[in-house]
Amino acid sequence: MPSIFVKIPETLCETIRLDQYIASIPQGMNRSKLKSTAQEILLNGKNAKLSSKVKKGDVIEILWEDNIPTDIEPENIPLKIIYEDENVTVVNKASGMVTHPALGNWSKTLVNALLYHWKKEAVPQKKDVSQNEILKSRRPGIVHRLDKDTSGIIITAKNRETEEYLSSQFKERLVQKEYILICKGRPPASSGDVKTQIVRDSKNRKKFKALTDTTDGKFARSIYHCISCYGPYSVVRVRIKTGRTHQIRVHMKYLGCQILGDKLYSKPDENFPNVPLMLHSRKLVIKLPGKEKYHCFKAQIPSRFYEVLKKLKKKYPKEVMPRVKCIR
């Protein structure tokens, strides 16, 4: 369940109702939207009401239903379209773009951009069908997500039937998802099959951690292959068999090689202190409606990867790791 944390600054001089404070901040929402969207509200780790009083130093956590709002405004935001037909749009999402509107990000999301794009291409083919009627039949069917700072492939459905068809493939784990990443540190082996439980970190609820000695949390499996190394850095390909929140980031930390630029799970690197998250969804293999065979989509590797690799090649000799038999 998505959540957002708000720490009340020391500059707040008086106590105020929780809902009034949330409405006053830039990423906030009014009481009616908060009441209809929020699934749970925590104040300093304990359940709270909208009428609860808050003061400086308090920490509010709002957990909301993972549903896409219906009142989304189309926005003219450039998109990198990989593939499109009457049922789907496949996009190479940019790093820094949120997938869909939610608390803290009501605009400039992928869904806002898609609605504008679909509006442009919704040209009536029949005289008795209006553009608005075409748009009403199209809804932002988000069947999987990428973290805000993760770039790469996202497939979206244009109608309910396609959304259900694609969602069932993700649910049954029939979709192949492959990522490319640059890490600080080397994996313990040239390849491996990581199987753990992923649980929320009790000390920092924004984070998750991987555990093997518990049945709590959710099972997660990631298959990795180290492509090459440059000194203490490594280029890794990961195929995930499950789709847990922060899964690759958590599993890489578990292996002792945090993803470069991951501000949540690692400290800034001395050689790359300001680099963005070096995690990219490279490949997606899935069946499309009406097609018998699986379709393989690939997203171009972004320039930030080549910039980092260029610096690494100047400083360290390249070590190519041995090829291994693919783990199923």
For the regions a protein language model found, what residue spans apply to each?
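RNA pseudouridine synthases
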Residues: 1-193, 197-199, 298-307, 311-312, ...
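Pseudouridine synthases involved in rRNA/tRNA modification
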Residues: 1-36, 214-221, 231, 241, ...
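Short beta-strand micro-motifs in enzyme catalytic cores
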Residues: 89, 179, 234-236, 282
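Short, conserved beta-turn/loop elements at beta-strand boundaries and strand-helix junctions
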Residues: 119, 188-189, 203, 228-233, ...
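Short aromatic-glycine motifs in intrinsically disordered, low-complexity regions
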Residues: 205-215
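Long C-terminal interaction/binding lobes of large macromolecular proteins
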Residues: 224
